[in-house]
Curated annotation (Swiss-Prot):
Cell location: Cell membrane
Record organism: Bacillus cereus (strain ATCC 14579 / DSM 31 / CCUG 7414 / JCM 2152 / NBRC 15305 / NCIMB 9373 / NCTC 2599 / NRRL B-3711)
Topology within the bilayer: Multi-pass membrane protein
Positions of transmembrane segments: 6-26, 37-57, 71-91, 101-121, 131-151, 162-182
Family: Belongs to the MntP (TC 9.B.29) family.
UniProt cross-references to InterPro entries, sorted A to Z: Mntp/YtaF, Put_MntP
Protein name listed in UniProt: Putative manganese efflux pump MntP
UniProt entry tagged with the keyword Manganese: yes
Keyword tags: Cell membrane, Ion transport, Manganese, Membrane, Transmembrane, Transmembrane helix, Transport
Function: Probably functions as a manganese efflux pump.
Entry's Gene Ontology molecular function annotations: manganese ion transmembrane transporter activity
Domain of life where this protein originates: Bacteria
GO biological process: intracellular manganese ion homeostasis; manganese ion export across plasma membrane
Recorded name of the encoding gene: mntP
Length: 182
């Protein structure tokens, strides 16, 4: 692979990673420990490897029409997660709120990586080199998720409980933006 072929993949990796960054800003406003931030970022990175890989494999056999379905599903997941964060912040006390672990972490990581599935579909049809592409997507998304989570964590310290509500609203807004791009 030449450098000229690698540049568009790097740009795509950052574009997909910005989704993870934006959503992680909101998630970072939840009460998270550094260990959880590390684990969340790694999980997002792994999903950004798995999802485009599946997309690339399927993209070699399926038409592009499924990209819209993946886009819609990712938006709905983000909106649902955002409402959950707002709900848990307003209606539950501090002890009952849960950090994104277990199934909620996988739902979160799936939601922010679903766009990479549709990109993988397109790249699979195009015939891009699979290993380089998925590793690049995973690494960049993991790095940007960590940055977003850490910035969100510091913003939460400044905003308190309202920061968590703002984080949930950011997720809902981002999901709505995916559904209805301006």
């Amino acid at each position: 692979m030449t450098f000229e072929q690698l540049i568009p993949l790097i740009i795509m990796a950052f574009a997909l990673g910005m989704d993870a960054f934006s959503v992680s800003l909101g998630m970072g406003m939840m009460p998270l420990k550094l260990r959880q931030i590390l684990y969340i970022g790694m999980t997002i990175g792994i999903f950004h490897i798995i999802m485009p890989f599946i997309g690339m494999v399927l993209g070699r056999f399926l038409s592009e029409k499924y990209g819209d379905i993946a886009h819609f599903a990712g938006a709905i997941l983000l909106i649902g997660l955002g409402f959950y964060i707002v709900y848990s912040t307003i209606l539950q006390n501090e002890e009952t709120r849960t950090a994104p672990i277990g199934i909620s972490l996988f739902v979160f990581a799936f939601g922010v990586s679903i766009d990479s599935f549709s990109v993988g579909l397109s790249l699979g049809i195009y015939g891009a080199q699979t290993i380089i592409t998925i590793l690049l997507f995973g690494f960049v998304s993991m790095l940007l998720a960590w940055i977003g989570l850490l910035i969100g964590r510091h913003a939460k310290d400044m905003l308190g409980t309202y920061g968590e509500i703002v984080g949930g609203i950011i997720l809902v807004g981002f999901g709505l933006y995916i559904l209805f791009p301006i």
